[in-house]
C-alpha cells in the first residue's frame, strides 16, 4: 500500500464494488469495505427513484461486507427485468451503482 492509498482511505468512509454477476438472475452480490465502523444504509431503487428493496441498514463494523439482492421488492414480489440502482450511504459518503436484472 502506498502513501497515496493510505491518504485516500483516510478520506473515504467506504469502497463500493460493482455487483456480480451483472446482468443477473435470480440474485446478485454487492461487496463493500467500511474503513471504520458506523451506520450503513444500503438500498435498491428503480430508475424513477422509487425504493425497491432495503439490502442493509444498521451499525456495521469496519471491514468487508456482502449484500445480496434476490431480485425481490420490499413486499417479496419479484421485480421486473430492468436496470436498478444500488446506493450505499455511510458517514456522510454516498455512492451509487447500476445493475441489470434479467427475468
Locate each region found by the language model:
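Glycine-centered coil/turn sites that cap beta-strands in beta-rich domains
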Residues: 1-20, 24-45, 54, 69
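C-terminal tail/sorting-segment detector
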Residues: 2-4, 59-62, 77-103
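Residues that cap or initiate secondary-structure elements
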Residues: 25, 36-38, 61, 73-75, ...
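Intrinsic-disorder/low-complexity, polar/charged segments enriched in Ser/Thr/Lys/Arg/Asp/Glu/Gln
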Residues: 27-29, 39, 64-66, 83, ...
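Generic structural signal for well-ordered beta-strand positions
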Residues: 52-53, 79
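Signal that preferentially marks extracellular ectodomain short beta-strand elements
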Residues: 67-79
Amino acid at each position: 500500500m502506498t502513501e497515496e492509498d493510505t491518504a485516500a482511505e483516510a478520506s473515504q468512509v467506504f469502497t463500493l464494488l460493482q455487483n456480480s454477476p451483472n446482468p443477473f438472475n435470480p440474485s446478485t452480490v454487492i461487496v463493500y469495505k467500511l474503513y471504520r465502523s458506523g451506520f450503513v444504509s444500503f438500498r435498491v431503487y428503480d430508475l424513477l427513484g422509487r425504493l425497491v428493496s432495503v439490502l442493509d441498514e444498521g451499525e456495521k463494523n469496519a471491514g468487508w461486507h456482502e449484500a445480496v439482492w434476490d431480485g425481490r421488492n420490499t413486499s417479496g414480489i419479484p421485480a421486473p427485468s430492468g436496470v436498478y440502482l444500488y446506493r450505499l450511504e455511510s458517514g456522510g459518503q454516498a455512492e451509487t451503482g447500476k445493475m441489470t436484472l434479467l427475468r
